Amino acid sequence: MSRISLEVCVDDPDGLEAAVAGGADRIELCSALGAGGLTPSPGLMAVAAPPPVPVYAMIRPRAGDFIYHRADLEVMRRDIDAARHAGLAGVVLGASLADGRLDARMLTKLAGHAAGMGLTLHRAFDLVPDFAEAMEIAVDLGFERILTSGGAKTAPEAVDTLERLIELSAGRISIMPGSGITSDTIEALVPRLAITEVHSSCSSAEPANDMRLVEMGFAAPERRRTDAAKIRAMRARLDAPAAKA
């Protein structure tokens, strides 16, 4: 098995530094990881470039569902423009219909607007009723990879499904497991799965440093921060001989 790439999601400048220092191969740049990841600000995109490793910006204009309308599309197009202007390598996209299927028309418009940039399909994929249908849409639109937990809350809970997705992909698109992947849980996935990349936050919990901020509603009692040591630990597990067996 060839070297497995590690993508780390971050949502602030400190996270960017930690990801690079820890040895991430690619960065998913977001804001508000506590809400599942939203579009980063143009300022954060600019700080991320020129990056020492490829950076893909999450394009998700709001928390909640992935059902987008005309006004959302205009916002997302402008966010893609900001990522391109910042010199980022790619964008992370997803859009759903009310029944959970991928919104092929919306994704066609978004992918077309991002022409020339790398494309990752995010975990809107995990909500679809038919993985095969959704994968064909992603392949037809030129996505490089699908970030997925196999439809479960965490990827280690859905190893059998992930294995089927990899077989279904037939080398046409990368299946990148994500959600709940740590240096302790990665052994559930490799070497069993023939994957070339994984996604993780590699983060540590950190309590709020001022409870007044929590009381006033400006901060959560706890937040996750990208941890360079956890990235190094994950990298070591991925590079271990057992992971390549």
Swiss-Prot record:
Highest taxon above the source species: Bacteria
Classification via Pfam families: CutC (PF03932)
Main location: cytoplasm
Cellular-component GO terms for this entry: cytoplasm
Record InterPro entries: CutC-like, CutC-like_dom_sf
SUPFAM superfamilies associated with the record: CutC-like
Localisation per UniProt entry: Cytoplasm
Molecular functions (GO terms): copper ion binding
Assigned keywords, A-Z: Cytoplasm
Similarity remark: Belongs to the CutC family.
Protein's UniProt name: PF03932 family protein CutC
Natural source organism: Rhizobium meliloti (strain 1021) (Ensifer meliloti)
Protein encoded by which gene: cutC
